[in-house]
Amino acid sequence: MTQEKMTSVSSRIVHALCCVLLLAASRHVIGSELPLDKIKLPPGFKISLYADNVPGARSMALSPDGTLFVGTRGKKVYALPNRGKRAGELITLASGLNTPNGVAFRDGALYVAEINRILRFDNVESHLRNPPRPVVVNDSFPTDTHHGWKFIRFGPDGLLYVPVGAPCNICEPDPARYAGIFRMKPDGSALEQYARGVRNSVGFDWNPDTHELWFTDNGRDWLGNNAPPDELNHAPHSGMNFGYPYCHGRAIADSDFGSAHACSEFTPPAMELGPHVAALGMRFYTGKMFPENYRNQIFIAEHGSWNRVPPIGYRITLVRLKSGKAASYEVFAEGWLQGLFAWGRPVDVQAMPDGALLVSDDKAGVIYRIGYGDV
């Protein structure tokens, strides 16, 4: 074995041991025991529990009537009627599904993304406790479970956007099937690829002023503690290529595949995020509760690293825009990570009608509410 390979193996062993210690320390804490006082926020902001028993809470979608739908990476989808600062009773809308991470709401129907298909529950709010049998909208997606869970959302063009992750850490998958963002009509027809070279996006939104797509992307593993960065990308039109698997961040050529293409051939990220932070859900904040300087800025849920020493992420960050371009990257809420102990992992963010910001947490199994002032 060469010295280079021995060093690589040793590095991975150290990473693995640290991960074991982190997981061992990260016991599940029930909602009433969560140390919310550990969460640091800018002055004037407050965090509380919106729902304290939502096992595996992941992606969120809000209906115009205020019902919050929550996907999971287990087998269930939940519904939470809005009761103001606290959610109503947790309702199990569906069970027995295949990793129903993604949820989206349109015209009275809930769309749910499994690994390889999109389902639709029609007239769902009239039948939360006894929903109709779902309609299979599209079942043509790959069955790979590696990066197979999906975030979905309807764009301003009325189309449903669906990412398909790379089925690996680093490889050259079929570019027509993997590592991209796709879109289709609400009935599942006219499926087409919108963006390429996207390793694993689990969150996107559209700028409310320009209606252009922005999305997060998770960087590859095993290039070191500080490389590559996760990414916030801007895709104002279809057909753009963001570099995976050849290039990471603005100019990091991949150690396995980078010789095939120069980084200059691809669209660079709008903002490089922290390395291995696992940037997932993101939203442009359009509410009126927060101070004006937060309006139309991007909140990002960073789920947290699994193989970095020391751990990083486990927080909500804010990317500020200036003249339509990403200008700064800062921490908004942190404290879920205490040393090597992570008691919570943010997944998605969702603004409520009153302007409060909800944050889902699949580790603690809760949904937080971040408000400003006494509201």
Residue ranges of model-derived segments:
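Beta-strand-rich domains and repeat architectures in extracellular enzymes and scaffolds
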Residues: 48-73, 278-284, 300
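Asp-box/WD-like beta-propeller blade repeats and closely related beta-sheet repeat scaffolds
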Residues: 116-155, 163-166, 195
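Conserved beta-propeller blade signature
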Residues: 67-71, 109-112, 159-163, 212-216, ...
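Beta-rich catalytic cores
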Residues: 56, 89, 96-99, 106, ...
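Beta-propeller domain segments
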Residues: 30-41, 149, 166-169, 183-189, ...
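Surface loop/turn motifs at the tips and blade-to-blade linkers of beta-strand repeat domains
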Residues: 49-54, 91-96, 137-144, 193-197, ...
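Short loop/turn segments immediately following the C-termini of beta-strands
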Residues: 72-73, 115-117, 123, 165-167, ...
